[in-house]
Amino acid sequence: MAYRNRNLASQTQRPLAPTAPRRRPVVTPQISDRSRLRGFANVGSGPCHPLTDRAANQHLQTYEANVKGSFELIVPFLKRISALQHDQDFVSKCQSLARSELGFDLPSHLLEQAWVRALDMRALFAWCVFQSHQHVSDHFFQEDPLQGGEGSIQAKHFQSFLVDCGFHLLDVSPCADGRLAHTIAYALRIPFSSVRRRSHAGALFDVEKTVNRWIKTEHRRYREGVPNSADSPTRYLKVVTYHFSSLDPSHQGCAAHGSDDALAASAGQQRLLDFRESVENSFCCGASVDLLLIGLDTDTDAIRVHVPAADGSIVLDEWLSAEDLYHETLSLTSDEAMQHIAERVEAIAPKKPDEGMVAFIVKLIANNFSQIDYVKQSHAGPYPDAGHAERFIGVGIGFKEVHLRNLTYFAHLDTVEVGAPDLDVGVKIFKGLNVSRDLPIPVVVRFDYSGQVPGARDRAVTDCYRVNQAIAERYSELFDQGLLHTFLTIRDRDKKDTSEVVGSSLEPVHQEAH
């Protein structure tokens, strides 16, 4: 296959610019309202809970429908051009259709082979997924469609609220399952820039790396007074979000824990306790952190909160269900509902809870009511896609722009060797989603870097190619059959710019002269 480029890792000394089209499109894909909103009912109509934010629901639905609608256009488009590949003016006709319907060009070297061999639809499918993701990424960083970027009104208000609750930083680790990718912006309704998010299979975050991030946070408080001064009586709040299925608990729960809800919760709690113990053992003067364990029902997006006592203790088999509270407060006024939630939070804690933690949990539950209504009104009940329906795997460090359910399976890692368990789960999921339909697994590799550090960009590029080579070797059978494609990107986290493409397995392989 002429387009296969397995040895990208050996080319890190060159500029690494793919020869396939990379310019940002100037044509916006024409997605009809029907295509955009397929599967979505209007969330602006129908009865809601008094605490539900109707305007926010409408805004979030429009964003989700537009993004997912762009991915849904891919297969119908490819079916159309498949029927045209023997036309005399196929290449020009195909590119014109691609620009008008998808908003980007297709790789010319793949189209130009159509007269001598069948179109490589696997490669074209992967390319369309990658470019659609780039559209989403560009729009996210340039326009802040979720209105939660750094400096936004929502982010400022939430940070002020967080400090009032007694916390200076919120660090959340959801499961890497794509059904939790929307945890922050949708399920919890928190501005994305106000949260440090790292997803891991089973929500089993790396304790050592989290301790290092805690150290950097406390050091910055001491040196710069950001987000507040080191002498302020606030704490670092670490949250684990595991997941479960209320409709099919034995099959649609967390794959990393064998769909065992109790195991998912206990493993998350243990990882939290290990983190706190590591901080307390390593630093003196009462250094510690606050912990919170949350479960998310992937069928309804309702959360359940294991309310901790002031000393951090929780009872694993006791939690507060947002779904239950939603129904308990449905006939109350908004003020009465908030009061009822607060009373229930305090009552279920094993011992007297911290006042700031109570206020924080009350807000999360109240926010979650909007998401409960969002799911009910968008889909007339639970999500129709109870299982996995992700569009691509995201590998590496980054993906700040992904905040939609079932869009991306995350595998946050520095090396494939260390992150193999997360990545293996993702590949297994996509064997069922894509390979079973003879479609490839699209893998976007991303490494964010700090542009303020000399040489950081070059190291990020090297990391991309190193991980790409490791993926090609670990999944060589899929890779060699064109059933796994990679797209390499980097991004300067110190800027609001979008990601930069530095390579792809879809680049043409140039034959050496003899």
From Swiss-Prot:
Binds 1 Zn(2+) per monomer. Its EC number is 4.2.1.1. Zn(2+) binds at residues 175, 243, 254. One of its GO terms (molecular function) is carbonate dehydratase activity. One of its GO terms (biological process) is carbon fixation. Disulfide bonds: none annotated. Residues 1-27 are annotated as: Disordered. It is found in: Carboxysome. It comes from the Bacteria. GO terms for cellular component: carboxysome. Keywords: Bacterial microcompartment, Carbon dioxide fixation, Carboxysome, Lyase, Metal-binding, Photosynthesis, Zinc. Belongs to the beta-class carbonic anhydrase family. CsoSCA subfamily. Reversible hydration of carbon dioxide. Essential for photosynthetic carbon dioxide fixation, supplies CO(2) to RuBisCO (ribulose bisphosphate carboxylase, cbbL-cbbS) in the carboxysome. This is Carboxysome shell carbonic anhydrase. It comes from Prochlorococcus marinus (strain MIT 9313).
